[in-house]
């Protein structure tokens, strides 16, 4: 079956969602040899992935994942694809604490850096969060403090079967896209940054197929896989089962546009310092971009009417100390229970 479907991709035909799921199930069960996995990756990348293929692959990966149960009806993730090459600080990770500071349940999915100096796992580790916390403990932490970090390798062990092929081929493939679509806590509200403007609608449509309630998939025209405050941002909104795409400009949000260099980060230690400084209330462009992104996540969660309302709530969570309190609570909880 795998080889038949591979021939279909090679001939330039798109797969149905269930066909992609079948291929991924075979890969993630260890049934497929490395050369065939490499061929699958390369053929799909050459043809160009569709949103149905993306959803089909994500569905398989979700089924194989170690799941955690969260009692809240609203669970937010701010995990993006990464790979934008912009070398900014960890905007979406910092935003996650602000969202949690507004009383919204956050299950932040993430990993170590692939292409940047510092991934979400790297900065959280530098902040004192224990990464290798058992899923049951993470589940408990989300219930008790309202936020948890889901370190991808702890939940997606079946991905090990694809790793040799990924390392051998060395190209950006469908596997680079699946992280934000495979949250082990089943996050139903997302702010999802992507590395290419062509992916915003594709990811929003995939999230629709996967049953997300509301999501914003974003890409800054300056290349950021976040809502940018340096340039317009392309936004694909999934709401009430419909996807619509629009651009949003910094001035529409009453934010003073800045140069992207003002959002620069560094290694894990430097980025940890930036995150802490923002959550402690230091004003400036770095705090502004976090407020904008957290604000959008709050709209996705249904606790803010629009981006400006979300931004006001995000700013209040920083100024009141609630956002910093969530970081401190997560560090304490993982250190004591990890």
Swiss-Prot record:
Mg(2+) 2 binds at residues 225-226. This is Anthranilate phosphoribosyltransferase. It comes from the Bacteria. Its cofactor is Mg(2+). One of its GO terms (molecular function) is anthranilate phosphoribosyltransferase activity. Pfam families: Glycos_trans_3N, Glycos_transf_3. 5-phospho-alpha-D-ribose 1-diphosphate binds at residues 80, 83-84, 88, 90-93, 108-116, 120. The keyword Lyase does not apply. The keyword Metal-binding applies. Pathway: Amino-acid biosynthesis; L-tryptophan biosynthesis; L-tryptophan from chorismate: step 2/5. Belongs to the anthranilate phosphoribosyltransferase family. GO terms for biological process: L-tryptophan biosynthetic process. Homodimer. Its EC number is 2.4.2.18.
């Amino acid at each position: 079956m795998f080889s038949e479907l591979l021939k279909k991709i090679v001939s330039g035909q798109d797969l149905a969602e269930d066909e992609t799921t079948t291929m991924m199930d075979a890969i993630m069960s260890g049934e497929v040899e490395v050369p065939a996995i490499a061929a699958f990756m390369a053929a799909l990348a050459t043809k160009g992935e569709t949103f149905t293929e993306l959803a089909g692959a994500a569905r398989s990966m979700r089924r194989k994942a170690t799941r955690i149960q969260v009692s809240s009806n609203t669970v937010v993730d701010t995990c993006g694809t990464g790979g934008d090459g912009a070398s900014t600080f960890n905007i979406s990770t910092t935003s996650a604490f602000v969202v949690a500071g507004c009383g919204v349940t956050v299950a932040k999915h993430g990993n170590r850096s692939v292409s940047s100096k510092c991934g979400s796992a790297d900065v959280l580790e530098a902040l004192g969060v224990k990464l290798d916390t058992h899923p049951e403990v993470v589940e408990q932490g989300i219930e008790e403090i309202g936020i948890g970090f889901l370190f991808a390798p702890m939940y997606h062990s079946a991905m090990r079967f694809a790793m040799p092929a990924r390392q051998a081929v060395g190209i950006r493939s469908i596997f680079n896209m699946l992280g934000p679509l495979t949250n082990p806590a089943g996050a139903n509200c997302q702010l999802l940054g992507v590395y290419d403007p062509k992916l915003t609608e594709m990811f929003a449509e995939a999230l629709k197929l996967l049953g997300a309630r509301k999501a914003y998939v974003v890409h800054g025209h300056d290349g950021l896989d976040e809502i940018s405050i340096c340039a317009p941002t392309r936004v694909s909104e999934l709401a009430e089962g419909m996807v619509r795409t629009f651009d949003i400009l910094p001035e529409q949000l009453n934010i003073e546009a800045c140069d992207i260099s003002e959002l620069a980060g560094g290694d894990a230690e430097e980025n940890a310092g930036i995150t802490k400084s923002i959550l402690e209330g230091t004003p400036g462009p770095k705090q502004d971009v976090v407020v904008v992104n957290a604000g959008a996540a709050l709209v996705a969660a249904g606790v803010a009417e629009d981006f400006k309302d979300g931004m006001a709530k995000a700013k209040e969570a920083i100024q009141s100390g609630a956002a910093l309190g969530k970081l401190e609570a997560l560090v304490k909880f993982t250190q004591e229970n990890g």
